[in-house]
Amino acid sequence: MSGSDRGDRLYDVLGVTRDATVQEIKTAYRKLALKHHPDKYVDQDSKEVNEIKFKEITAAYEILSDPEKKSHYDLYGDDNGAASSGGANGFGDEDFMNFFNNFFNNGSHDGNNFPGEYDAYEEGNSTSSKDIDIDISLTLKDLYMGKKLKFDLKRQVICIKCHGSGWKPKRKIHVTHDVECESCAGKGSKERLKRFGPGLVASQWVVCEKCNGKGKYTKRPKNPKNFCPDCAGLGLLSKKEIITVNVAPGHHFNDVITVKGMADEEIDKTTCGDLKFHLTEKQENLEQKQIFLKNFDDGAGEDLYTSITISLSEALTGFEKFLTKTFDDRLLTLSVKPGRVVRPGDTIKIANEGWPILDNPHGRCGDLYVFVHIEFPPDNWFNEKSELLAIKTNLPSSSSCASHATVNTEDDSNLTNNETISNFRIIHTDDLPEGIRPFKPEAQDSAHQKARSSYCCIQ
């Protein structure tokens, strides 16, 4: 089974092709997430259906937007991390060819070793010390506003006096304390068996961890008389460092900020690893997260979402509603002037009131989407028929409805078998049987579109 046959489901969920760019995947996710966000739906059944769809879309985006996860998915076609079935035993022809491409090419390291040893040897023979991971606990406001943090750290550095050997320097003469590595017998690499599928095992050469691939290492002094006076025979010293971490506005939780070359130094390593600061979440963010209906983890985008409920009269005549308190302590109030009609299904888009765009030189933000729920009155809400008449008189009539009322009345004037339907059930458009589309007269659609073009609502 080819990779394209077994690994297209997540691409289909987002409606993109396998060769889609990161931006195309992000754009597709934002459109679908806005369309299927469960808070847009009042009906409980519709809410539950779209909640499932929303979670499926988000899960697909989390994998396809991550290069490492996407690569794994493209290869194995399984978003749960395990290889999907291919061939008779879960190991297909493509996997078999990849195995031989990885382990039986490029010759060997010195002409006498296992084929493919050179690649494995080079990959394992790292010249850099290990990275250090540090968690930073932040609030949503910290991420929105940005924050500068200082850390007092102690890091290990190689002793200058003994150059990391741990031995007391000898005057006038140079003494070496290198010995052959017994772990790899001086070869610098060791043979290891690696499993690539059911019944498929190969021998692979990897760098020796004890000597770091050199075949030898420096023997540490045991007698305190031979200890370096500065590092007491350890070869390393502890050094205090003040590290400044700038959390720029617009970061998300799970983002990683890297400070290059400031990890611990290690003996026999030519370069230092990095400090990696992982942005984690403080628990007091729950209320704000519920207000903005957003996943604030990494890759979540810059748009924010919230919702309001208005009455039918407010939808027709305008309204002024408090929205929320922003992360920079502003109070946002939405004002829709009389004359602008908000229709069922409309979503109000407020530009530049979303999440900050990371490293944007102009300080731009994403957008704030406001899902509008229109609360209709219950049946038989009126007290007098005169109230209904007043509404009919003041509201504009539909020309399309009038045209339907007069169609073919002259030809049908002699018919006596007329019937008025009063027993019916009103259902939501989302609950229509599959394949049935709601009818929209062209004149009504045109008028609707013209009215909507004058203000910033999207559907």
From Swiss-Prot:
SMART domains in the cross-refs: DnaJ
Domain of life assignment: Eukaryota
SUPFAM superfamilies: Chaperone J-domain, DnaJ/Hsp40 cysteine-rich domain, HSP40/DnaJ peptide-binding domain
ZnF (CR-type) intervals: 146-240
UniProt entry keywords in alphabetical sequence: Chaperone, Membrane, Metal-binding, Mitochondrion, Mitochondrion outer membrane, Repeat, Zinc, Zinc-finger
Residues covered by the J domain: 7-79
GO molecular function: ATPase activator activity; Hsp70 protein binding; protein-folding chaperone binding; unfolded protein binding; zinc ion binding
GO cellular component: cytoplasm; mitochondrial outer membrane; mitochondrion; nucleus
UniProt subcellular location: Mitochondrion outer membrane
Example GO BP: protein folding
Keyword Repeat: yes
Ranges occupied by CXXCXGXG motif repeats: 159-166, 181-188, 208-215, 228-235
Keyword GTP-binding on entry: no
Pfam families cross-referenced by the UniProt entry: DnaJ, DnaJ_C, DnaJ_CXXCXGXG
Other observations noted: Present with 1210 molecules/cell in log phase SD medium.
Protein's UniProt name: DnaJ protein homolog XDJ1
Organism name: Saccharomyces cerevisiae (strain ATCC 204508 / S288c) (Baker's yeast)
